[in-house]
Amino acid sequence: KEVKYGKNSRIDIFVDNPDGENSYIEVKSVTLSRYKQLSEFPDSITSRGSKHLLELSEMSKKGNKCYLIYLVQRSDVTKFSIAKDIDQEYYENSLIAKKYGVNFFAYKCNVTKKGIDILNKLEIIEN
C-alpha cells in the first residue's frame, strides 16, 4: 500500500516489519533505450524522482531498509543505467542515495495484454 513518508511523499510499497526495521520500496517504470541493449532512466527531467531519492536517503539514514526498483518494460536490453545527460540532478541524488544505503535493482519485464511479468535482473552500469 502507498504510505506517506518524509516531507511530502508517498512510497509505492511499505513493509512494516515487527522488528522495527521497516522497508520502503519505490518503483519506477523504464521505457527509454538510446543505445544497444541499454535501458535508461529518467527519459526527461524528474524533480519528483529526485525528491524520492532524497526521501529514501533520509529513511535509510534512520535505519530503515530502502529500495529503488526500476522495471524495464523492454525485451531488447541487458543493462540499465541512470541517464545522467538527461537529468544531472537525478543522477547526483542517486549517488547520495547509494551513499546512504539505498539499494538499487533493475529488472527486465515482458509486457503483454494479460499483464507484466518480471523476467530477470539487469546489470546496473555506473556512469
Give residue ranges: language-model regions.
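A short acidic/basic microdomain associated with nuclease active sites
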Residues: 1-6
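Conserved catalytic cores of phosphodiester-cleaving nucleases, focusing on short active-site segments
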Residues: 11-43, 56
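Alpha-helix C-cap/termination motif
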Residues: 16, 59-62, 100
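Residues at the starts of beta-strands that form the adenosine-phosphate
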Residues: 21, 65-67, 103
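Nucleic-acid nuclease catalytic cores
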Residues: 34-47, 54-86, 108
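A general structural detector for well-ordered alpha-helical segments in enzyme core domains, enriched
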Residues: 52-55, 93
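Domain-level recognition of nuclease-like catalytic cores that cleave nucleotide substrates
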Residues: 73-127
